[in-house]
A protein has these predicted regions:
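Conserved N-terminal alpha-helix of the aminotransferase class I/II PLP-enzyme fold
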Residues: 33-79, 86, 108
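Conserved active-site segment immediately N-terminal to the catalytic lysine
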Residues: 169, 183-194
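A glycine-/small-polar-enriched, mobile loop at the entrance of the PLP active site in fold-type I
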Residues: 3-54
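Active-site C-terminal subdomain of aminotransferase-like
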Residues: 15, 193-274, 288, 357-358
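Active-site phosphate-binding strand-loop segment of PLP-dependent enzymes
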Residues: 10, 109, 120-176
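PLP-dependent enzyme catalytic core of the Aspartate aminotransferase-like
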Residues: 2-4, 316, 329-358
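PLP-dependent aminotransferase-like
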Residues: 77-144
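Conserved PLP-binding catalytic core of the aspartate aminotransferase-like
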Residues: 283-314
Length: 358
């Protein structure tokens, strides 16, 4: 079988061992005679799956007991509406804009009430993330929202905000489980699964218990976090197979040694790629060094007419998904947990050869 390295931003690369395990269990899960795809979400087999998935996720991500974990649908985009519906309660909210996705969260929240921008780096092209020390927080606001890793612009927060006055809400879609996080610093964390957790379709939400009682009475039941908690994320049929696949990824991470181990691997991979980009004038990355994402690495070629031929040449060598997002162009390598360092080395070797020939 042809070796392919998938640098797509999402849906993204999955661990090979996870894919092989899913393949072996596809037609008969643990002697049940059924595929997980066929199981009733309320049957004993699937209930055992989802309970273990939550237990493993809590252990892996060190989720405190006073937080609930939800397995929902609609992607992070749905949370752009669910956050104000569940938290605003007639107050205003603060938003930090550090890239396309955090700006989208702000814009999607506007119909629900008074939203203010606490900080923004849009004027500098999102070249760095606004420092939490500079956020203009309104202590009477219902919450402050930010995106801790911007997938398109390649901007990541490494020093998380420590704000005690109001709840902090974080969109962690594209770097969740890439390193340990102190969850007690947050009121809500949410993440689409299709980047660093598993297949598309699943959205994980972590909510502190004290934030479950302030939802707007107009909140649809499927959007109400408390209602979802009371129904074990099953107010409607959940994304059963995506949850099962996420569970296999959690087991893979646990067997690997946990988030401390995967963080070291991610640092090594990012250093290899950024190291080569910085070593030559042929390629460049525009992001402030202290905010360079370990997961999403955008870069450009000095002669921008070469971007298309670079991507095509990479595809011919089995490296796919390198075309930059349509909003910013250029090239982007998404190097999530499941991307082996061999994939990064193959990309760097190709970058060297491409530079020599151009």
């Amino acid at each position: 079988m042809k070796c392919t390295y998938n640098f797509s931003a999402g849906p993204a690369v999955l661990p090979k061992s996870v894919m092989l395990r899913a393949q072996s269990e596809m037609l008969d899960w643990h002697g049940s005679g059924m595929s997980v795809m066929e199981m009733s979400h309320r049957g004993k087999h699937y209930m055992s799956i989802i309970e273990k998935v939550e237990s493993d996720f809590r252990s892996l991500f060190n989720v405190p007991k006073n937080y609930k974990v939800l397995f929902l649908q609609g992607g992070a985009i749905a949370q752009n509406s669910m956050v104000p519906l569940n938290l605003l309660h007639g107050k205003k909210a603060n938003y930090v804009v550090s890239g396309y996705w955090s700006k989208r969260s702000y814009q999607d929240a506007l119909p629900f009430g008074d939203m203010t921008i606490a900080a923004s780096s849009e004027a500098i092209g999102y070249a760095k993330a606004p420092d939490p020390k500079d956020w203009k927080i309104d202590s009477s606001a219902a919450y402050v929202h930010f995106c801790s890793n911007e997938t398109i612009h390649g901007v990541e927060y490494f020093d998380m905000p420590s704000i005690k006055t109001i709840p902090v809400v974080a969109d962690m879609s594209s770097h969740i489980l890439s390193r340990p996080v102190d969850i007690s610093q947050f009121g809500v964390i949410y993440a689409g699964a299709q980047k660093n957790i598993g297949p598309a379709g699943l959205t994980i939400v972590i909510v502190r218990d004290d934030l479950l009682d302030v939802a707007s009475p107009l909140t649809p039941s499927v959007f109400n976090w408390k209602t979802q908690v009371e129904n074990q994320s099953m107010i409607n049929t959940p994304t059963t197979y995506s949850i099962y696949m996420a569970g296999l990824v959690f087991e893979w991470l646990i067997e690997l040694g946990g988030l401390e181990v995967i963080e070291k691997q991610n640092i090594k991979k990012a250093e290899l790629l950024y190291g080569y980009i910085d070593s030559t004038d042929f390629y460049s990355n525009p992001i402030d060094i202290k905010n360079r994402s370990r997961m999403n690495v955008p870069f450009r070629i000095q002669n921008e007419d070469l971007h298309t031929s670079f991507v095509t040449g990479a595809e011919n060598l089995g490296m796919i998904g390198l075309k930059g997002h349509r909003l910013v162009g250029g090239i982007r390598a998404s190097i999530y947990n499941a991307m082996p360092i061999e994939g990064i080395q193959a990309l760097v070797d190709y970058m060297k050869d491409f530079e020599k020939s151009h």
